[in-house]
Structure formats: C-alpha cells, structure tokens
Curated annotation (Swiss-Prot):
Transfers the gamma-phosphate of ATP to the 4'-position of a tetraacyldisaccharide 1-phosphate intermediate (termed DS-1-P) to form tetraacyldisaccharide 1,4'-bis-phosphate (lipid IVA). The gene is lpxK. ATP binds at T60, V61, G62, G63, T64, G65, K66, T67. Transmembrane segments: none annotated. This is Tetraacyldisaccharide 4'-kinase. The lineage of its organism: Bacteria, Pseudomonadati, Pseudomonadota, Gammaproteobacteria, Pseudomonadales.
Length: 333
C-alpha cells in the first residue's frame, strides 16, 4: 500500500501517531481560516459572474460521489429548460493553453478524466482552468448560459458562488475530524454550517444534518464497442477483476459485491494513469472498472473490459429543495 493510501486509511480509521501532526494542523487551520475571512470581508477580491454559480464540492480528501451528482444536476437543469455550463480545475490535465474548452474527442491527458467523462456523457460546455474565475469568464464569452456548475472549488474563494453543495461519504463521514495533515479535512468541520446543503453519499434517506443520495448501478458498458448490457450480463458469483482509480476505491468494490459478483480488487490512486501492462492481471477474467477510469483505457481495452455506469439518485426532498433554490437564483435581477 502506498504511503498516501496508508495515510488516508489512518485519517478515517484513526491512528495515535497522527497526534504528532497536530502542530502542523493548527498552522494549516489558521491559514485556511484567514484566507476565507479575507474573501468574506472583501479584503481579497473575488469574481462574481453575471449568472448563478453553484459549487459542488467537499471539505474532505477522498471520493464523495461528486461527478455522478454533477451529472444528475446537469440533466435535472436541462429538463427545466436551462442551459448549463461547467468549470473544473482539470486535475492532472495538460492542455495546450488555459483556459481550455474540453471536447468529447480529446484524450484524458489533455482534458482530465473527470471533465472528459462529464463532456462525453452530457455534451455540456466545460472549461478547465485552476483559476475557476477565469474559466467562468471564458465560458460565458463563448456562449450564453443560464447558470454554471463548479466541479469542486469549495476552497477556491476567488470565484464568488450563489449556492454551495457539500458532499460527504456517509460511511466514512469526516474521519477523525481533524484538518490536514492530521486528518482528511480541507477546512474545519464548522465550515459545513455555512454551506447551503450537505449531501451524504450512501444515505438512503435524508438526515437531520443533510440530504441523502445513492449511486445506483444502471448498466455495464463495453470499453471497445460501447455496447450496453444489463447488469445480469454477469451471473451471480461471477469472478472478475475490479479496477478503481478513484478517491474511495472500496466503495466501488462494495458496489460490485452488492451485485453478487466476486471482484478481485485492484485499487489505484485517484486519477491514476493506466496502460495495458498495468492492467494485465492473472488469472484471465472479465475486467470491470469505473467510468472515470474507462475514459483513460479505451485505446488499449480488451474485448472483455467493461465499466459500470452509475447514476446519482438524490432524495425527493433534495430535488424539491434544489428546484426552489433555482427559482430563487434565476429570478434575481
């Protein structure tokens, strides 16, 4: 297990050695708290877009189901007749220039795995740039939009936001509740009090402190042909290699177990790069991966490689709440 994986496990399981990092944690907390205070007071300038900006992010390190939720938000807004754009940092992307408009035919090295997935699934206009405010301005200059979704960027305060949605893994929660590097929190836990909504991935029902949503498997999709198969394509008890280069690989493996398959788990680091050699496992079995990983593997995929398509399913209460927020934001002068 890599050091980063061991550290992540310690943050969520708890480890007495982390107490040695508390002086650094105190320094980190002071820095991030002061940074946010400067933007809230107006001491540091932020860019406010002429259309509503909705930030979808988290305060923890590790996967929380952010990309499936963004896909749900895009589709939901479109059903309401709204034209939506997305901005993202584009983690790991190496575009020729910044800002960079992501197209469906680009490679993940150029566009980033998550932005490419979003564009391939939805065709939404999407701009990547570590400077999200610059990405928003470039996106609005390219075409008219009703609102913008910011993929992550909770801590990017140079971009003013009209709505903040914070996602948390319901099983792992906030780990040991401590900030980096002594814990998984990017900001202190009390930051949640200022968010407009907290959504718990894996909660089948709403909670007193937020809404619930689940990731529902919908189909198997072949990497080479694009063919979609029902989930019963593999019988109960099927052994298969399971690949996950996401923030919380175990959640993916648990999903496969829940489908009554027998996965041989192969966890990789989040945003990992793959090759045919790195995925040449023994014994020879069908291989199932996440959709985020699949966008990086199509060029060398074997015939029996599949990705598991999943859809975010928030509770009806969240859908109603979100519709009310949209009405409020879009009728602002």
């Amino acid at each position: 297990m890599a050091f980063a994986d061991r550290l992540l496990a310690a943050w969520y399981a708890g480890h007495p050695a982390l107490a040695l990092l508390r002086p650094l944690e105190a320094l980190y907390r002071r820095v991030v708290t002061r940074k946010r205070a400067r933007f809230l007071s107006g001491e540091s300038a932020s860019y406010r877009a002429p259309v509503p900006v909705i930030v979808v992010g988290n305060i923890t390190v590790g996967g929380t189901g952010k990309t499936p939720m963004i896909l749900w938000l895009i589709e939901h807004c479109r059903q309401l007749g709204l034209k939506v754009g997305v901005v993202s940092r584009g983690y790991g992307a190496k575009p020729p220039q910044l800002p960079w408009r992501v197209q469906a035919n680009q490679c993940a090295d150029q566009a980033g795995d998550e932005p490419l997935l979003i564009v391939q699934r939805t065709g939404v206009p999407l701009m990547i740039d570590p400077d999200r405010s610059r990405a928003v301005q470039a996106l609005l200059a390219s075409e008219p939009l009703d609102l913008i979704l910011c993929d992550d960027g909770m801590q990017h305060y140079r971009l003013a936001r009209d709505l903040e949605l914070v996602l948390i893994d319901a099983a792992r929660g906030l780990g040991n509740g401590r900030c980096l590097p002594a814990g998984p929190l990017r900001e202190p836990a009390e930051r949640l009090l200022d968010a407009d909504a907290v959504l718990f991935n894996g909660a089948n029902a709403d909670r007193a402190d937020g809404f619930g949503f689940c990731l529902q498997p919908s189909a198997l999709v072949n990497l080479r042909s694009g063919e979609r198969r029902a989930l019963d394509h593999f019988p109960a008890g099927q052994r298969l290699h399971a690949v996950a280069g996401i923030g919380n690989p175990q959640r993916f493996f648990n999903t496969l177990l829940g489908l009554n398959w027998q996965p041989v788990p192969h966890p990789f680091a989040d945003h990992a790069q793959f090759s045919a050699q790195s995925l040449a496992f023994s014994p020879q079995l069908p291989l199932v991966m996440t959709e985020k990983d699949a966008v990086k593997c199509r060029a060398f995929a074997a015939d029996d490689w599949w990705y598991l398509a999943v859809e975010a399913q928030p509770t009806p209460a969240f859908s109603a709440w979100f519709d009310n927020q949209l009405q409020r934001l879009l009728r602002k002068p």
